[in-house]
Amino acid sequence: LIHLYVACNPLKVMAEAKQYSNISSPLVAPIKLLSDQVRKKLNKVKILNFGVGLQDSSFKFYNSCSNIPKLYTVAYALSIAASGKANKIYLAGFDGYQKNDRRLKIIDEIFQSYSKAKGAPSVTAITPSNYNIQKKSIYTL
């Protein structure tokens, strides 16, 4: 298993900078989106730069960057896995939001767009999930 922290939204990184300063695993983030102030706060954190661009409703994967439809960590993390040539992606703890929560629809749209992208490995939830993705019991793997 690879142990990484992933963050792409500069405002969230700024808000969570103190927590990141205590992590022992690398943080993958688009360095160009981080302000100098945030970078200074993260000076003791090993940051792996993976660039990101926004592109309407689609994903594109490259060696050191990707285009994603929304600046959501799940989209960024999926694009990192695809760019790294992962064969499969298993999700645990992605239980999702309640059926009437608009965020459920947004994340479902991200998963739908991702599944259509060229070079996207399959995504399977191995714990219960409200998202519209393939599900499989962890005990059947």
Protein language model features and the residues they cover:
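Metal-ion/cofactor- or nucleotide/acyl-coenzyme-handling active-site neighborhoods
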Residues: 1-141
